[in-house]
């Protein structure tokens, strides 16, 4: 089977970090191409792609009207002649003139207001979580659920460089984008933890970059949390997979989230997690059985749950059960295999 995956960029977001793992798994038994349209390509992510995958970098400038990258895309497709063209974001399929093969779209997030306009163009729609599936069904489009996957075996789970300052170290790994990722909620919660509840024996590490970085840093300064909150900047996936295990608590305060790859990664590193009680992350912790959750957008409830963790510490049995749950349900090999089964079903 010949499979062509198309995506706008190869940065450090959840889709981009997962795609190399998916195509590399599929390339073990199939001919696979990965086509990146725009010129935003993170070299450390690209380096993860298996050598058997045909990588096509079109190097289009975002928003460019130059037709040449689109012509190159379709010339490649005509030569490669894929059985499956698999798109991962809105408007990608509009670039494809190639008339053959079946078209598949993975829906990677909730709050999809524009994407449904193009859903009828696909032979199969795939949602990454029950939350995304339910939303898409509610919009009138049949779809199946295939959970996102992570390379569990590559994630270390034994502390290798533990912190030696006697403090609890919390972490969030994501784009600095308060509208979706909710870092402002977490900062307000940590303000309460320190100034209302009187706990200051912690350090919060934000890993990532984004448009809201300056605003968040100003917020931290105004709340007198400069000693408790550190902005680590962008770290590559290797750093994340090797260092997550050294932290005491992973916190994901997203306002909305289709899935939450970094939540699964933290669990694979055997780190306790605290997430907002939205459906994507909540699904990963089995409705709250395998981790902590707080009321979405509620900084006070988030603070209360952090204080509970500070007082009670990690629950080893829960951490181990969560780890096994992620191994069984969210390993990337399972995701890649299920995609192949879908391709085969629509090619019959």
Please provide the spans of the model-predicted regions.
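Active-site donor-binding acidic/aromatic loop of nucleotide-activated sugar
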Residues: 212-215, 225-236, 243, 292-293
């Amino acid at each position: 089977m010949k499979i062509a995956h198309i995506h706008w960029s190869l940065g450090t977001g959840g889709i981009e970090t997962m795609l190399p793992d998916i195509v590399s798994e599929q390339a073990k038994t199939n001919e696979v191409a990965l086509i990146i349209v725009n010129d935003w390509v993170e070299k450390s992510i690209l380096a993860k792609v298996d050598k058997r995958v045909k990588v096509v970098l079109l190097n289009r400038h975002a928003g460019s009207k130059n037709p040449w990258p689109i012509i190159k895309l379709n010339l490649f497709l005509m030569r490669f002649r894929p059985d499956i063209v698999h798109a991962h974001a809105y408007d990608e399929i509009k670039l494809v003139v190639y008339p053959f093969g079946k078209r598949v779209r993975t829906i990677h997030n909730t709050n999809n207001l524009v994407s449904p306009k193009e859903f009828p163009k696909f032979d199969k729609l795939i949602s990454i979580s029950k939350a995304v599936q339910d939303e898409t069904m509610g919009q009138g489009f049949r779809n199946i659920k295939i959970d996102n996957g992570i390379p569990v075996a590559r994630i270390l789970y034994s502390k290798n460089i533990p912190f030696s300052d006697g403090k609890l170290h919390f972490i969030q790994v994501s784009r600095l984008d308060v509208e979706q990722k909710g870092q402002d909620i977490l900062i307000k919660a940590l303000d309460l933890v320190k100034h209302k509840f009187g706990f200051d024996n912690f350090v919060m590490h934000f890993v990532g970059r984004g448009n809201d970085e300056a605003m968040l840093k100003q917020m931290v300064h105004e709340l007198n949390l400069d000693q408790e909150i550190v902005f680590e900047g962008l770290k590559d996936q290797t750093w994340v997979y090797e260092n997550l295990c050294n932290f005491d608590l992973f916190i994901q305060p997203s306002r909305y989230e289709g899935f939450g790859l970094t939540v699964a990664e933290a669990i694979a590193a055997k780190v306790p997690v605290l997430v907002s009680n939205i459906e994507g992350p909540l699904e990963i912790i089995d409705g709250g059985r395998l981790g902590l959750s707080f009321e979405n957008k509620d900084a006070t409830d988030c603070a209360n749950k952090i204080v509970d963790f500070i007082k009670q510490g990690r629950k080893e049995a829960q951490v181990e059960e969560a780890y096994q749950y992620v191994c069984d349900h969210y390993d990337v090999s399972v995701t890649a295999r299920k995609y192949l089964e879908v391709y085969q079903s629509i090619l019959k």
